[in-house]
């Protein structure tokens, strides 16, 4: 006779499964994205952000972003199992079945949409839905496998969060929010290309046409350097239109110089670890840049 499972035996399995679901949402990526959402919200009003749209907006956008990440896991599950960086993900490892993953992704996205539509505003709900489709279907399912410019074109979906935060509070599209989108859109290619250089052989193995695979490492390094210069220019736009003050100007200039320096090192020095250094620096660059935007907004623009 088979012995029934005890609570002490069942609980670890449930915990592991929920950890797998949580991992599918790419929490670190979503956390950085939510920072840009929050900054978009704060910059949209001169004073304190209204609590209700702030909480509901952050929750709804987070759920739909997590859903998009889960769809990414689903679509990429076969190639993930062949790459060293991703073979340990829940689906390749069999921690979650495909059916359960689909149910989770659809449920999380639907709940997020309902929250945004009913508790925030329809504009934010539909824009977030468009971003989900852009990332999960247009980028992951098509562009990623179709062109070496996948990151450039598909980067628009990933650049939307500050605009979503802005519309969550104001219920309107504003030019200032679009400037923040331009910054992230320009930041995305050098960020991902640096990682792609480090993982070039893995991408080639699974036939993903990342730029280092199709055009070579040296060409990619040149593109990274050029894009960091373009990003430095994009980061000045909020100052040029009067959106930000000297705190942001100084902070963004220092960050831009640092990014250009790292890209210059990558281009002209042949150290294997430099590509990952650029990749990691780019994450800190975006995070600190948006924190500086927030500080400038409250301690200078509205002082």
From Swiss-Prot:
A single Gene Ontology CC term: plasma membrane
- Write down the chemical reaction(s) this protein catalyses: heme b + (2E,6E)-farnesyl diphosphate + H2O = Fe(II)-heme o + diphosphate
S-S bonds: none
Query: What's the Enzyme Commission number for this chain?
Result: 2.5.1.141
Q: Which UniProt keywords apply?
A: Cell inner membrane, Cell membrane, Heme biosynthesis, Membrane, Transferase, Transmembrane, Transmembrane helix
According to its UniProt entry, the protein's GO biological process terms are: heme O biosynthetic process
Supply the PROSITE patterns for this chain: UBIA
Q: Name one Pfam family in it.
A: UbiA
Instruction: Give the top-level enzyme category.
Output: transferase
Q: Does the keyword Transmembrane helix apply?
A: yes
Question: Where does this one sit in the cell?
Answer: Cell inner membrane
Q: In which pathway does it act?
A: Porphyrin-containing compound metabolism; heme O biosynthesis; heme O from protoheme: step 1/1
| Cited InterPro entries | Protohaem_IX_farnesylTrfase, UbiA_prenyltransferase, UbiA_prenylTrfase_CS, UbiA_sf
Predominant location of this chain? membrane
Q: Which residues cross the membrane?
A: 29-49, 51-71, 96-118, 123-143, 150-170, 177-197, 223-243, 244-264, 281-301
Molecular-function annotations in GO: protoheme IX farnesyltransferase activity
Q: How does it sit in the membrane?
A: Multi-pass membrane protein
Q: What else is known?
A: Carbon 2 of the heme B porphyrin ring is defined according to the Fischer nomenclature.
Name the HAMAP family on file. Answer: CyoE_CtaB (MF_00154)
PANTHER family named in the record: 4-HYDROXYBENZOATE SOLANESYLTRANSFERASE, PROTOHEME IX FARNESYLTRANSFERASE, MITOCHONDRIAL
Write out the function statement from the record.
Answer: Converts heme B (protoheme IX) to heme O by substitution of the vinyl group on carbon 2 of heme B porphyrin ring with a hydroxyethyl farnesyl side group.
Task: Write out the similarity annotation.
Answer: Belongs to the UbiA prenyltransferase family. Protoheme IX farnesyltransferase subfamily.
Record's protein name: Protoheme IX farnesyltransferase 2
